[in-house]
Amino acid sequence: MNRVATAAVLIPLVILALFKAPLWLFTLLVFGVAVLAAHEYFGIVRAQGFRPFAAVSYLFLALSFGSLYALAYFASIDYVDGAGGLAVILMLGLLGGLGLITLTAALVLLLGGMGRDPLSQALPDASVTLMALPYIGFTLGLLPLLRVPSNGALYVLYLMLLVWCGDIAAYYVGRAIGKHKLAPRVSPGKTWEGAIASVLAAAAVGLLLFRFIEPITHLLRSAALLAQPSHTYTPAPFRSAPLWLVVLFAISVNVAAQMGDLVESALKRGAGVKDSGTLLPGHGGVLDRIDALLFALPVGLIFIVTGLGRYFSDFSQ
C-alpha cells in the first residue's frame, strides 16, 4: 500500500515539474534529487568501509549543475531565437568545462586524501567520492538538456515510461514465473524471465506510444501541460521514424536501465544493505528509484544526437 501511495503522489509531481516548471526551477529540482541520491550513495560506500569527502562532492555537484544549466539555457536560446552556431560553440565550451570540473575535483580530492590515516585510504576514498560526479551528477544533469526543445518534455516522459514499464514487467513476471537467476551474486531476486519480460514490455510500450503519440500529445495540450502548436512545433516527435528504430530505441533504453539497476544492487550487496535509504515509503531511497534512469538517460541522449535526431524535429534544426 505504501508503495502505491508513494507512486500516486510522486508521478503527478514529476510530470508537473517536467512539463510546467521553468528551466531554472526544473534544474534546481533535479539538482536536489542528485544531492539526495549522492547522500545515499555515500551511505552505501561508508558501509563498505570508505570515508568519502561528501562536502567536496556536493560542491562539485553544484558546479556541474551550474554548468549544465548554462548549457541548457544557451541551447534554449538557440532553439527559440535562432542564435545559430553561437550556441553550439558555447555548448562545446561548457562540455569542456565539465571535464575541467572533473579534473579539478580529482586533484582536490587527492590533496584531501593526504590527511587520511592510514594513507592507504587516500586513493580509495578519493575515488569513491569522485565517482558520484559521473554516476549521479552528470547523468541526472542530462534531464535539463533533453527537456530544452519544445518536444523535449514529451521525449523525457517517453523515456521514463519505457524505464518504468520495463521495471514493472520484470518485477511481476519474475515473481510469477521466474526460475533462472540473472545475477545471483548481485541480486538473487532478479531472473532471466523477468529480464526478458522487461525487454518485451519496453518494446511493446515503445511501439504503443509511437502509435498513439499524437492523441497523447493532444491530451497533454488539453491539460495545459504541453504548449499549443506553433510554426516550430511538431506534435509527434517520432511520426516518421521507422519501426525498427523505435524498437531499437526502446530495447536499448531498457537494457541500459536494467544494467543501472544491477549496478546499484551490486553496490548495496557489497555494503550489506537492502535499500539505499528510507525516504520513499515502500520504495526505499531516492537512489533506488533512479538507478535505472541513471543509465537510461545517456542512451536517450545518444539516440537524439544520432539515430532519432532527424525524426525529432526540434533537435535537428
Locate the predicted segments by residue.
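Membrane-embedded alpha-helical bundles of polytopic integral membrane proteins
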Residues: 1-252, 315
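Hydrophobic alpha-helical transmembrane segments of integral membrane proteins
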Residues: 8-9, 277, 294-295
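Short helical (or helix-break) motifs at transmembrane helix termini and adjacent helical loops
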Residues: 165-175, 257-269
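Re-entrant/interfacial helical elements at transmembrane boundaries that shape
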Residues: 175-176, 267-271, 294, 298-299
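Hydrophobic transmembrane alpha-helical segments of multi-pass transport and channel proteins
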Residues: 251-259, 286-294
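Interfacial loop-to-transmembrane junctions
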Residues: 269-292
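Final/C-terminal transmembrane alpha-helix of multipass membrane proteins
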Residues: 289-305
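Juxtamembrane boundary at the C-terminal end of a transmembrane helix
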Residues: 304-317
